[in-house]
Swiss-Prot record:
<dbReference type="InterPro" id="IPR002180">
    <property type="entry name" value="LS/RS"/>
</dbReference>
<comment type="function">
    <text>Catalyzes the formation of 6,7-dimethyl-8-ribityllumazine by condensation of 5-amino-6-(D-ribitylamino)uracil with 3,4-dihydroxy-2-butanone 4-phosphate. This is the penultimate step in the biosynthesis of riboflavin.</text>
</comment>
<dbReference type="GO" id="GO:0005829">
    <property type="term" value="C:cytosol"/>
</dbReference>
<dbReference type="GO" id="GO:0009349">
    <property type="term" value="C:riboflavin synthase complex"/>
</dbReference>
<dbReference type="GO" id="GO:0000906">
    <property type="term" value="F:6,7-dimethyl-8-ribityllumazine synthase activity"/>
</dbReference>
<feature type="binding site">
    <location>
        <position position="120"/>
    </location>
    <ligand>
        <name>(2S)-2-hydroxy-3-oxobutyl phosphate</name>
    </ligand>
</feature>
<protein>
    <recommendedName>
        <fullName>6,7-dimethyl-8-ribityllumazine synthase</fullName>
        <ecNumber>2.5.1.78</ecNumber>
    </recommendedName>
</protein>
<feature type="binding site">
    <location>
        <position position="15"/>
    </location>
    <ligand>
        <name>5-amino-6-(D-ribitylamino)uracil</name>
    </ligand>
</feature>
<comment type="similarity">
    <text>Belongs to the DMRL synthase family.</text>
</comment>
<keyword id="KW-0686">Riboflavin biosynthesis</keyword>
<comment type="subunit">
    <text>Forms an icosahedral capsid composed of 60 subunits, arranged as a dodecamer of pentamers.</text>
</comment>
<dbReference type="InterPro" id="IPR034964">
    <property type="entry name" value="LS"/>
</dbReference>
<feature type="active site" description="Proton donor">
    <location>
        <position position="81"/>
    </location>
</feature>
<comment type="pathway">
    <text>Cofactor biosynthesis; riboflavin biosynthesis; riboflavin from 2-hydroxy-3-oxobutyl phosphate and 5-amino-6-(D-ribitylamino)uracil: step 1/2.</text>
</comment>
<feature type="binding site">
    <location>
        <begin position="78"/>
        <end position="79"/>
    </location>
    <ligand>
        <name>(2S)-2-hydroxy-3-oxobutyl phosphate</name>
    </ligand>
</feature>
<feature type="binding site">
    <location>
        <begin position="49"/>
        <end position="51"/>
    </location>
    <ligand>
        <name>5-amino-6-(D-ribitylamino)uracil</name>
    </ligand>
</feature>
<dbReference type="InterPro" id="IPR036467">
    <property type="entry name" value="LS/RS_sf"/>
</dbReference>
Length: 151
């Protein structure tokens, strides 16, 4: 994509950083392949996955970004915490998208094991970050095509 008329933000969880850094690299590499320039991208780190929706909301509310890619890795443990985190993050991201009409790309891996997460962050299953970059650019284009004017 050669037009530079859009900006996008990436919100990345620091928790499970070994995985999320790889996802971020996948997003950034794919955006570079799509001719998206560094000055069109803002990357923000949050402590954990639960904090992603709040920062996504703040970025969406600013109206500076045409899409927001949310990256995290929630890996099942021995307690029910995994279920609560997954539900809160997915619901929160969806609420932001619907409230602000900004594409929120849900790039949060929810896996049973670390091995599954690494497999999807540049391992044998590829890097899902590249897919999420494609989704962000596609949604930016679609939202421009289907703009609604207030009359």
């Amino acid at each position: 994509m050669t037009e530079s008329s859009f900006k996008l933000a990436i919100v990345v969880s620091q928790f499970n950083r070994a995985v999320t850094e790889k996802l971020l690299n996948g997003v950034l590499q794919r955006l570079t392949e799509l001719d998206v320039q560094a000055n069109q991208i803002k990357t923000v780190w949050v402590p954990g996955a639960v904090e992603i929706p709040l920062l996504a909301k703040r970025l969406a509310k600013s109206k500076h970004y045409q899409a927001i890619v949310c990256l995290g890795a929630v890996i099942r443990g021995e307690t029910d915490h995994y279920n609560y985190v997954c539900q809160q993050v997915s619901f929160g991201c969806q609420q932001v998208a619907l409230e602000y009409e900004v594409p929120i790309i849900f790039g949060v891996l929810t896996t049973t094991t670390k091995e599954q997460a690494f497999a999807r962050a540049g391992g044998e299953r590829g890097n899902k970050g590249a897919d999420w970059a494609d989704a962000a650019v596609s949604m930016i284009k679609l939202m421009k095509e289907i703009e609604i004017t207030d009359e």
